[in-house]
Amino acid sequence: KEFSTGMRARLNMIAALSHGARLLILDEPTSGLDVIARNELLDIIREYVQDDCSVLISSHISGDLEGICDDLYMIHDGEIVFHDDTDVLLDEYGMLKLTNEQYAGIDKINIRYILKCDYGYDCLTDNRQFYVDNYPDVVVEKGCIDSFLNIVEKGERV
């Protein structure tokens, strides 16, 4: 009998869990799954890590990473180019949208990456609150993993 993509993913996960391993290495475990199957698989992973086990996930689906991972690593061309706790990333990091004039006059002490764009600069900061408090005219967005990955990959490290 033919299994759906979701059923195959669940079957693969059950097979992996049946070995009693304390570490699972999963490559794109939710790729190609519909929302329901993906959420079910993520729930299985969450249950697994509550038993003092670990999972290393390689994924391009950033929403899955935000909801399940403790640490986020970005690997580009075989090199770790970014690492931080996912909670820190979501709570403290942010994206600054700066005109050329704003960029020239802003304190860059907390800027980690910059990306030149049509209106000026996108900047990744690891201290969003610093810019909210000290630069009220600057657009400061709470970041998401997608925006971080984009600027880390395409931008320049400061």
Q: What kind of feature is each model-predicted range?
A:
Residues L42-L56, H60-T125:
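ABC transporter nucleotide-binding domain
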Residues K1-G63, G67-D70, H76:
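ABC transporter nucleotide-binding domains
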Residues N39, L90, D146-L149:
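Generic structural signal for individual residues within well-ordered alpha-helical segments
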Residues G32, I80, G94, P136-V139:
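Short N-terminal micro-motifs specific to bacterial/archaeal maturation
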